[in-house]
Amino acid sequence: LRSVGPAIDVYKMIASLKPSNTNYAGTVQAAYSAYNMLSSTEKQYVTNFATLQEAKNNADSVQTVISKIAGISPTSRNYAKQVEEALAMYNSLPSAVRKLVTNYDALKSSQKEADTVDKVRQLISEINPNASNFESKLKSARSAYDKLSTQQKRLVSNYFLLEDYEAQLNNSSFFF
């Protein structure tokens, strides 16, 4: 019975794992370490080891998401892709552990910024110089672009089209 004691303690540690615990990752690691110190015979008595494995995977995934969000660079040409990937990773987490992502607010802010830039890119891509609404679409896109921060403006990959369309409009107005 004495050799079962440590196994029971580990079992209880695993049973008490709650994602709502502020030190969830540390508690998971402690339970994992305690399990690894058991003999192979004692490990057989820990019937909730699968729960520990799942908790460890979740804690590792949360840390991966936190690192991914921290690595988002607003100066990168791949900014929108970085935000999209981090958001997909966050959304793939079980809902019970999402609240453990300590920098989620930074991700939400980055997503909002990326969405704003995407809207401007979309406005520019919808401009058709042969359409009757060419000038109004051009003005809308220019207005939206001008409202962006300097940092956001750098992320508008099709800005050159906006400039080209404005040059076309200016050149065509000389002929009327």
PLM segments and residue spans:
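Beta-rich interaction/scaffold domains
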Residues: 1-176
